[in-house]
Amino acid sequence: MISEKNSIYFSNNKNEFFALDERTGVIKWKQTLNSNLRPTYADGLVFTVTLEGYLVVIDSRNGNIVRMTNLFEQIKKYKKNNIKPEGFIVARDEIYLSLNNGKLIIIDIKTGKSKNILKIDNGKISRPYVLNNNMYIVRDNSIIKLN
């Protein structure tokens, strides 16, 4: 859940993604998306990633989907069923998406296409965090700093 420009954006466990008026609680718009990740707001757009690995960019004013891109298209079909997004951040011109298999996908924000896939660990890693222009990821009992 995030709050931005007098709206609250969130998803529920019924494959619904909402924008609510922050003051009244009235639904501004609703989309059918199955995401359990925290969305991100940037330049009038709401970004989220579905459980199937689709990057969804939504116009925050009216709820229209601007773009939907399959981020898992480079992953072999038999592996897709076991891979789930863990979290993502929008930073500069890129989106960083962590996966439950220890990989981090770097995505071009303009095209929605994967630029690179980094193997961070063999298991689950956290959503990326940024502090003082450095990115951090938590895995097992350690914190990894990425440059």
Question: Where are the regions that the model predicts?
Answer:
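Solenoidal tandem-repeat scaffolds enriched in leucines and small polar residues
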Residues: 1-22
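Short loop/turn segments that connect beta-strands within beta-propeller blades
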Residues: 21-24, 60-63, 108-112, 147
